[in-house]
Swiss-Prot record:
Residues 468-667 form the FtsK domain. Consists of an N-terminal domain, which is sufficient for the localization to the septal ring and is required for cell division, followed by a linker domain, and a C-terminal domain, which forms the translocation motor involved in chromosome segregation. The C-terminal domain can be further subdivided into alpha, beta and gamma subdomains. The alpha and beta subdomains form the DNA pump, and the gamma subdomain is a regulatory subdomain. It holds the Pfam family FtsK_alpha. This is DNA translocase FtsK. Residues 189-806 are cytoplasmic. It is found in: Cell inner membrane. ATP binds at G488, S489, G490, K491, S492, V493. Signal peptide: none annotated. It comes from the Bacteria. Homohexamer. Forms a ring that surrounds DNA. It comes from Chlamydia pneumoniae. The chain crosses the membrane at residues 16-36, 64-84, 96-116, 130-150, 168-188. Essential cell division protein that coordinates cell division and chromosome segregation. The N-terminus is involved in assembly of the cell-division machinery. The C-terminus functions as a DNA motor that moves dsDNA in an ATP-dependent manner towards the dif recombination site, which is located within the replication terminus region. Required for activation of the Xer recombinase, allowing activation of chromosome unlinking by recombination.
Amino acid sequence: MIRERKKSRHPRLPTLPLAAKASLYLFFACFSGLSLWSFHRDQPCTQNWIGLLGWSFSSFLLYFFGAAAFFIPLYFLWLSFLYFRRTPRPLFFYKAAAFLSLPFCSAILLSMLSPVGTLPALLDTRLPKFILGNNPPVSYVGGIPFYLFYEGQSFCLKHLIGSVGTALIFGFVMLFSVLYLCGGIALLKKKTFQDGVKKAFCSFFQTCFKNLKKLINRRNYLPKPSVPFVSKNPFSCTKSQPSPRRVSETIILDGSISPLPQEEIPGSKKESFFLTPHPCKRFLTKFVEPQENKAKEGKTIALSSTPTVVRESKGKERAALPKLKSLAVPENDLPQYHLLSKNREARPESLQAELERKALILKQTLTSFGIDADLGNICSGPTLAAFEVLPHSGVKVQKIKSLENDIALKLQASSIRIIAPIPGKAAVGIEIPTPFPQAVNFRDLLEDYQKTNRKLQIPLLLGKKANGDNLWADLATMPHLIIAGTTGSGKSVCINTIVMSMIMTTLPSEIKLVIIDPKKVELTGYSQLPHMLSPVITESREVYNALVWLVKEMESRYEILRYLGLRNIQAFNSRTRNKTIEASYDREIRETMPFMVGIIDELSDLLLSSSQDIETPIIRLAQMARAVGIHLILATQRPSREVITGLIKANFPSRISFKVSNKVNSQIIIDEPGAENLMGNGDMLVLLPSVFGTIRAQGAYICDEDINKVIQDLCSRFPTQYVIPSFHAFDDSDSDNSGEKDPLFAQAKTLILQTGNASTTFLQRKLKIGYARAASLIDQLEEARIIGPSEGAKPRQILIQNPLEG
């Protein structure tokens, strides 16, 4: 009843259909246009096409609006066009005001700037004479507004702000109206446009400052004569002092400096003249070798332009410019992020509205299941969006966790991840894929790292977290890393990102890499890097030798630290050298120890294909090599218990898991399920020892073209010097010394002869070695005619007797 009364009190007026409104505006446009076009002030009203009504209507419009009245028919025609097309009219009032302000301002500006003689004949004949009496026709162009605002006595802009100020005001009003009608205001509000304007201004001012600095330096470096003289050259500009000429920066050194011929020397013949030394001599002396003063008159120096000639007394000789060295690039000049390509993807403006809509759906879903909760922060990363849910008191966290599939259904998400609770917060986190995913460009991470003061020892620029923050890690504190993921999940791209992080932030003298690539195509492009300890290892028989060499290097470094009384590599590199103590050591002690990083791709394939036990040196390095700066990065497609054994897992606290096949593999690699629900293409879970729980992030991407650019740039800056050209030599020397037998061969032989059991699993259990090494020992015992060949399910026959029994 109340609603009906309200409706009856305020009845709605009937509205005209759109076609009727369009026709009405079209009629007004034709009426005003024909009446204005046929108006003539010297002709009677009967000559007007619309008659007396049209003549009076035109006089009224021209009297009040001046020349701007001719835009009124266009305004009605624009309205008719909008109604005919049924175009939506947001902010119609403001657009109409902007449309009408254009002719109004233009008429006033025309009245101010146009003299009487240059008025168009069309306007001069159509403006009424009785408007302002004997005033010149230029006043009529603006109509009454021009007379009131500019020429009148009550409010005269001409005397208040002058003609320039008036033109400035109305000109800016016209510019603002044009921008508003064309959508320029919305363009100005966009962040991309603002950033572009900022960059343009910054680059402009930087260019100005650089040019100003060059000009100042040019003036400072201009050579000045030590003694002024009078030139006899008739073509010289002044008689008292020669005009200084700019000396080119290009120098061709042929030897010492010689005096000019006597015929060309102005002044006395008893005086000698020498060329002014190059103005950048102070800079050049940093990169030149000192040379003995053996200047003779026969040698000359050539400059690219004519230098200033100065006079010196006889007997005084100026030292010749020394010979230039090959300018070496400073070691601290590393490749910058400018080499890499930019990320051209722009985040759409509708992302925030879409996330708010998702948040509303999430809250409604929780309410429908009887969960009272509020929503906290909404964070958006490159591929993920994270919502914070603040449950009320009495709500069980496990109840929210059990609604994972229902929430994914309501949000129409391919997969979600619920963090119950968020570590350090009284909230539950829900991560869903963002509706507008973006790739994480490695250039952005490198640019942020190079612009910050935070410097890591072995930086790993991995990607961006779910909230959009950068994910950086220091391998020196991790201290080893395992990367697992199926084919196409982003594992190989992550390895490339890790290698690029190290080579673009550290010098070749600070870090050395040992890369093992059984696939022979993924990482072989890094062989020419100056950071490499050896070329990329692709043969499985070299892998064991490389790992054994790293173990020996680890033991050698520990011996040096023990001798010097130091605890780790950081103390060694920052020590004060005592050359007397270090010289008494039996081997040479270097000034610094570089970090060494071993990167092994496809660990599972190596464990199956290698005949030697590579698990033992890996475990030894993982247990002991941290203090001496040797670190390992392992990658595998199959994170099963046969590959990632208990000893490996215990010594690799830092792990990265991309999408895996099942929950069991996820449990093995990150100690919790969830990796099987990842989206792939760089979506990863990172487990760090310094952080409680896992971190979800999007891995960075770098293309092959950028990798090749960086490698070429590094090779041009630093020479490639391998410490070990190949590990084949180690294999040959070991085979010559040991007779191609395992060090445990004698122990395995004694054990088999004593027990009478010759099986691979028996040796693996008793000697505590891996399966591959135990199988290799069985093969060596068979070749030595100690045991017989395999006979299927039957045990092997022992061919010799135990010497103790005999």
